Swiss-Prot record:
Organism: Nitrosopumilus maritimus (strain SCM1)
Protein name (Swiss-Prot/TrEMBL): Large ribosomal subunit protein uL11
HAMAP family: Ribosomal_uL11
One Gene Ontology MF term: large ribosomal subunit rRNA binding
Gene coding for it: rpl11
Quaternary structure annotation from Swiss-Prot or TrEMBL: Part of the ribosomal stalk of the 50S ribosomal subunit. Interacts with L10 and the large rRNA to form the base of the stalk. L10 forms an elongated spine to which L12 dimers bind in a sequential fashion forming a multimeric L10(L12)X complex.
Amino acid sequence: MGEQKISSLVTGGGASAGPPLGPALGPLGVNIMEVINAINDKTKDFEGMKVPVTVIVDSDTKKYEIEIGIPSAAALIMKEAGIQKGSGASGTEWAGDVTMDAVVKVANTKLENSYASSLKSVAKTIVGTCLALGVKVEGKTPKEITAEINEGKWDEKFQ
């Protein structure tokens, strides 16, 4: 029968044997709790965030492999800002503030999965996500920070 792939979005460190994973894994004959515990161990760094997970099961040998994706940029920014959700009125109301170091940290996390050509380009994308969430950067609006990035003010952060 070959390989079976099960893709799901789970809460980091909080996957359970309930839906969607348990019912999908059951018919494949693997130890469900062993798989769930392995997922929770691999996603513990993303605690509380939605993380894409793919479980690949060889239905003949019952061996499995777990691939962990990266949470969305918005989820990573909200974690850095210490907020649960965005402002709801981005551009006029502000839900939080992050440092440029936090933006660079998120940009580095997203860099390998991005189509952008440089860390600076990814950082500008992350600042755009900050705007959508209503999160300021270094106490300034994301539009001001984008202008500063374009002027080269933050270039030392992107080395």
